[in-house]
A protein has these predicted regions:
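Terminal low-complexity tails and localization/encapsulation signals of metabolic enzymes
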Residues: 2, 245-258
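Glycine- (often His-adjacent) and acidic-residue-rich active-site loop
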Residues: 55-93, 106, 136, 219
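Crotonase-fold acyl-CoA enzyme core
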Residues: 89-205, 222, 236-237, 241-242, ...
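Terminal peptide-recognition signature
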Residues: 16, 20, 35, 53, ...
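Helix-loop "lid/cap" segments that line or gate small-molecule binding pockets
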Residues: 159-160, 211, 215, 229-235
Length: 258
């Protein structure tokens, strides 16, 4: 299987690691396919009780791979959000409880990956952000719903309208993160949490997860085709192209409302 996503199992705890450290674990096509395959594989493993998701290198995940997106046609290319949404949904539907361990930046799709896990533990130096407006993009409806579900309308507005990242302490204050620990204690805190889950009855864990998922799935019944079109128009806009180029070129974008 692809080295883009690694997996190790020990004592009922499966650790899934995004493994593109040189690209800050940006979500390219290969990583998304490997992540989906890992979760498919783990769902059939009866020895697994809990899945820990983490990133190699300095970042948890920096979101979509903008370089690949530009290479595939930029604003006129295939819809990149659909692939991310599909894989995030697969993570959320995992048969096992999932824990995101965020040691560095979790930005855009990386933030959403953490949110699509059941629990989140963060180092005090971690940051979370949804800077889509800063590159001319609109958050897809289903991902916006996940933010609303976890941090509520007021904090969702602030996070999306400003596009500014928040630190781990603030993320904990608004309910985005369950636990914040010093960076040097993150591994021990993760193991303690994972083992506290893993020693519980497997059928009970699966049943609890299924019950929660059924309640969450109600959001999928909301019609949002019109909002998907809004998202698509923004992605295809000149401003979005300018935003992506500016980020890759490490400069301030010049938006024209076009």
């Amino acid at each position: 299987m692809s080295d883009e996503v690694l997996c190790a199992i020990d004592g009922g705890v499966a650790t899934v690691t995004l493994n593109r450290p040189g690209q800050r674990n940006a979500m390219n096509t290969a990583l998304l396919a490997a992540l989906r395959a890992r979760f498919d594989e783990l769902d059939g493993n009866r020895d697994v009780r809990v899945v820990v998701v983490r990133g190699a290198g300095p970042a948890f995940c920096s979101g979509m791979d903008l370089k690949e997106m530009e290479a595939r046609g930029g604003a006129q290319g295939a819809d990149p959000e659909s692939g991310v949404i599909e894989v995030l949904g697969r993570v959320e539907r995992s048969r096992h409880p999932t824990v995101a361990v965020v040691h560095g930046d979790a930005i855009a799709g990386g933030c959403e990956l953490a949110l699509h896990c059941d629990l989140r533990v963060a180092a005090d130096v971690a940051r979370f952000g949804m800077p889509l407006a800063r590159i001319g993009l609109v958050v897809p409806f289903v991902l916006g719903q996940k933010l609303l579900e976890i941090i509520g309308p007021a904090h969702t507005r602030h996070l999306l309208f400003t596009g500014q990242p928040i630190d781990a302490r603030r993320a904990h204050e608004i309910g985005m993160v369950h636990q914040v620990v010093p960076a040097g204690e993150l591994e021990a805190a993760t193991q303690q949490l994972a083992q506290s889950i893993a020693r519980n009855a497997p059928l009970a864990l699966a049943g609890i997860k299924a019950t929660i998922q059924r309640a969450i799935s109600l959001r999928e019944s909301i019609a949002h085709a019109d909002l998907d079109e809004v998202t698509g128009r923004a992605r295809r806009s000149a401003d979005a192209s300018e935003g992506r180029r500016a980020m890759l070129e490490k400069r301030r974008p010049v938006f024209r409302g076009e």
